[in-house]
C-alpha cells in the first residue's frame, strides 16, 4: 500500500534563483510536486518563474493536474509589465502606436480537449501619431484627439470547444477614449471660435468708435441737451399747471364776487320799483 501511493520519481520542492544587482536582473524558478504518478500521490504539479530586468518584469505561474478526477489539465497565468511597445501604422490615415505594455494572460486546457484563453492588456503612456493629411484643419483636430489618448485597455477571450468550435470576443475602451477625446477637442474648438468671434467683434467696435468718434461725441452731446430740455420742460409744465390752477381760483373768486354785487343791485332795484308801485295806489 505504501509503495503504491508513493511515486518512484518525486520532486517535492525545487527552487533556483540568480540575481545581478548591477545589471538590475533577477530570475527565480520553483517546481513543486513533480512526480511520475500524480494520481497516486494526490497532488498536482505547480511551477512558477519570475524574471525582472530593469523596469520590466514577468511572472509565470501554473498548475498541471494529471489526477483523473479533476477536469482541468493545465491552468497557467502569465503577467508582464513595463514592456516597451511600438506598433507602426497599418495603413495611411491610421496612427502609429508607442507606449508601455502591461499584460495578463490565463490559459485553461481541460481534459475534454477544450481550451480557453483570457487576456487583459493595458497600454500606458501611449503616444498615437498619424502622418499629416488634407484638409489640414481636419488633421489638426485628429492629431489633437490622438494626443489626448494616454491609456488604452482591452480584454480578449478565446474559446475552443471540445468539438473544435472557435469563439473570440474582444472588449476595448479605445472607442470610448477616442469619443471622449474627440468631445474635448470639439469643445475646445468651439470655445476657441467663440473667443475669436468675441475678440473680432470688440476689435470692430473699437475701430468704428475711432472712425466715428466725432459723430458719436456730437450725438452724445445732442442726447445730453435733449435730456436737459426734457427736464426743463417738465419743470416748466409744473409751473404752468400751478399758475393755471391759481388763475382758475382767482377767476372763480372774482366771478362769485361779481355775481354777488349784481344780485345785490338787482334786489335793490326790484325793491325800489316795488316801493314806487305801492305808492301809486295811494
Curated annotation (Swiss-Prot):
This is Uncharacterized protein TP_0482. Residues 205-277 form a coiled coil. Keywords: Coiled coil. It comes from Treponema pallidum (strain Nichols).
